[in-house]
Amino acid sequence: KILLNADLGEAVAYFTEASLSGESSIIKPKQVEPQSDDFWKWRMHMAEQLASQLEPSRFGIKGIYVMGSTVNGTAGPCSDLDLLVHFTGSTEQRENLMLWFEGWSLSLAEMNYLRTGYETGGLLDVHLITDDDIAARTSYAVKIDAVTDPARPLQMKSRVF
């Protein structure tokens, strides 16, 4: 067996009896019961945290919104987190933005698994819209300033001068 301590940067190895199954003895988390029915509140909080770390000029974003079951208060333990992003950047900014969201999505999915015991493989469902989409009221753009089932705007990171 090898025991690692990343904080100290040290490892110890020692011999043990071979396991019969040939598999490592990785301890998997036990099945957990969902903590409560506040799934939408947790998702809203995490959407706000995500948005607060998002730099508009770096990624070419005019706005970010949360929508769907999180806004409606009906999200369950397996629900995704729907984000609507008003994007005006370059192709490179788009690629970087989607990678940034992928990192958040996988991290949030792991946190959700530890809270609920449900695996999702990714928690974010990101929809990009453009100025043209908003002008034509196409796609998800109709959610912005909608009378029924509107997308809720999120505060992004402020520019520091």
For every predicted segment, state its role.
Residues I2-Y65, V71-C78, F87-F161:
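Catalytic core of pol beta-like nucleotidyltransferases
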Residues D80-D82:
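Acidic Asp/Glu-based divalent-cation binding sites
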